[in-house]
Regions:
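Intrinsically disordered, polar/acidic, low-complexity terminal segments
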Residues: 2-54, 58, 64, 68-90, ...
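Transmembrane catalytic cores of multi-pass membrane glycosyltransferases
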Residues: 27-79, 89, 127, 163, ...
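Membrane-interface micro-motifs in multi-pass membrane enzymes
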Residues: 53, 57, 84, 105-148, ...
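Transmembrane alpha-helices and membrane-interface helical segments
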Residues: 93-94, 142-146, 179-187, 271-275, ...
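Central hydrophobic cores of alpha-helical transmembrane segments
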Residues: 109-113, 157-163, 300, 353-362
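Short catalytic/ligand-binding loop motif for oxyanion handling, primarily in non-cytosolic enzymes
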Residues: 121-124, 173-175, 413-417
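Membrane-interface transmembrane helices that cradle and orient dolichyl/undecaprenyl
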Residues: 140-155, 189-192
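Long, well-ordered mid-to-C-terminal structural blocks that present hydrophobic/aromatic surfaces
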Residues: 289-384
């Protein structure tokens, strides 16, 4: 196996960085090629405003002020994504050299799922929000790395890194806590003293408390709306939590498709579980008082359920639950933990079992390119609808003056015939795309139509006249100088079966 022996050779810091940078850039190539304006990107690019501070994310406003040399939020895509991906590659390199004293190429790949999270593809779809979310991952990793050397003296630095990560994207907290769980597993496996274990845990709790306090002081006073409200504790709360967990479990299960991925996921999960159990049993053999062994043993047992909980984490507890893929940032750390435990289970100096690590990463990279093509298909459909609407509005405006046009019904099911066959093969694509619209009012100024506004219902006492124009995807009503553009609820099947 000489051609692939280089995979087992130790890499320098520079070589590790180039490997992780290349892999990271390769993962975002589909988004650069698709160049798709996604959801909130429409109104943000149209208004050149982000309004992230009122969502508890002032760091994103600051990011665009710095990169855009302005007080607004100008669309700079893809520059912010390229820059933040490069910074994340630096942090991933530091993390790989933290986990392994002399990391090989395969060792470096173990930390790659911090970015190679299939659910993070939806985050990367946002041209505005995506770079801030990538940077939040970078800062979460840095918070961990500043927690491990001289823990007590570096607590305030790590807390600042953590607060900065939360100011960019709050679910980054799930990533940091997940990294702390992996760190505890590594410490137990390395047979560190109980005093060292408890000192590290105490330091991490202090960092979390300080980071949350700093973030609360800087961001929470400016938050508007009810996004931070927690779920009401009542009789229906447990049922609501159970429904949310079941829904997320069903979506995560969509990832495992095909015999190869099923086999890969099963083997890595089983091996990682066995390794976790072996570390736990070895813990009971420590030459320490029984109460200490039992205490650390129970803390150790909590790490696995906690890693699973952190897939969605605190978003499960919010009153306004967001069931979308972009909130599942913690899934990345669950994959890192599984790959790390799998690697630690492989016999020393053996390459063949470790090559198995490449399979899930290759699958996630493949999914990224498939998803990029789906984004391109959605972009083409949206552009067609917007141009068709613009043409019809322009034709109607020649016979009468339309002072105002209301757009209604732009939230629809995921209807994308061009991607239906791909979704049948990869069911998770529909959950990742999650575009419940054909076009948005903010998309029409790109076609020269600037008097379109969104509304949900006709004004009180006003009834729509019979449509003057009916198209397959929408219809147009007129009332004096006001037009009503109603997107239809599409019932046609998406499947396309050409006759041969």
């Amino acid at each position: 196996m000489p051609p692939i022996r280089w995979l087992s050779q130790a890499l320098s810091w520079q070589h590790s960085y180039w490997l992780l940078l290349g892999a990271s850039l390769l993962y975002i190539v589909p988004f650069l090629m698709a160049d798709q304006t996604y959801a909130d990107d429409y109104w943000r690019s149209q208004l050149a405003q982000g309004r992230w501070t009122e969502q508890g994310r002032p760091g994103v406003d600051l990011l665009y002020m710095v990169l855009g040399f302005s007080s607004g939020a100008i669309n700079l895509f893809p520059l912010p994504l390229l820059l933040t991906t490069g910074l994340l590659a630096v942090s991933l390199t530091r993390l790989a050299h933290h986990y392994f004293s002399r990391p090989t190429a395969l060792n470096c790949l173990i930390v790659l799922p911090v970015l190679y999270n299939p659910f993070f593809l939806q985050n990367l779809s946002y041209q505005y929000d995506g770079p801030g979310m990538v940077l939040s991952l970078c800062l979460a990793v840095e918070a961990l790395l500043h927690s491990t050397c001289k823990p007590l003296k570096s607590s305030w630095k790590a807390a600042l890194w953590m607060a900065a990560a939360l100011a960019l994207y709050q679910p980054a907290l799930n990533v940091l806590v997940g990294l702390y769980c992996i760190e505890f597993i590594r410490s137990v496996e390395a047979r560190k003293t109980f005093n060292a274990l408890f000192s590290s845990l105490l330091s991490q709790l202090i960092i979390l408390a300080m980071g949350l306090l700093i973030y609360a002081c800087l961001a929470i006073p400016f938050i508007k709306g009810s996004r931070t409200h927690l779920l009401n504790i009542n009789q229906g709360a447990l049922q609501e939590l159970d429904d949310r967990i079941q829904f997320l479990a069903q979506q995560i299960a969509l990832l495992v498709h095909g015999e190869l991925l099923e086999m890969t996921a099963t083997i890595i999960t089983l091996v990682a579980t066995v390794k976790l159990i072996s570390i736990a049993t070895a813990l009971l053999q420590y030459a320490e008082p029984l109460w200490r062994r039992v205490g650390v043993f129970f803390i150790f047992l909590v790490t696995a359920p906690l890693l699973i909980f952190l897939v969605s984490g605190t978003t499960l507890m919010l009153k306004d639950f967001i069931p979308e893929a972009r909130t599942l940032t913690g899934f990345s750390i669950l994959i890192v933990a599984a790959l790390y435990l799998y690697e630690r289970s492989c016999p020393p100096e053996t390459l063949l079992p470790r090559l198995f690590i490449v399979l899930p990463l290759a699958g996630m990279l493949s999914l990224s390119f498939v998803y990029g093509n789906v984004l391109s298909a959605q972009k083409e459909l949206g552009q067609h609808v917007a141009r068709s609407i613009a043409y019809d509005i322009d034709a109607l405006s020649q016979s009468r003056t339309l002072e105002r046009i209301h757009l209604r019904g732009f939230y629809l099911q995921n209807w994308l015939p061009a991607a239906q066959s791909a979704s049948n093969v990869l069911p998770v694509l529909g959950y990742l795309l999650n575009t419940h619209y054909l076009t948005l009012p903010e998309a029409l100024p790109r076609t020269g139509i600037i008097n379109v506004h969104k509304y949900t219902e006709p004004p009180v006492g006003e009834h729509l006249q019979p449509p003057v124009l009916i198209r397959p995807l929408y219809r147009v009503h007129l009332s004096e100088n006001t037009g009503y553009l109603v997107l239809k609820k599409i019932t046609e099947p998406q499947d396309y079966h050409p006759e041969h």
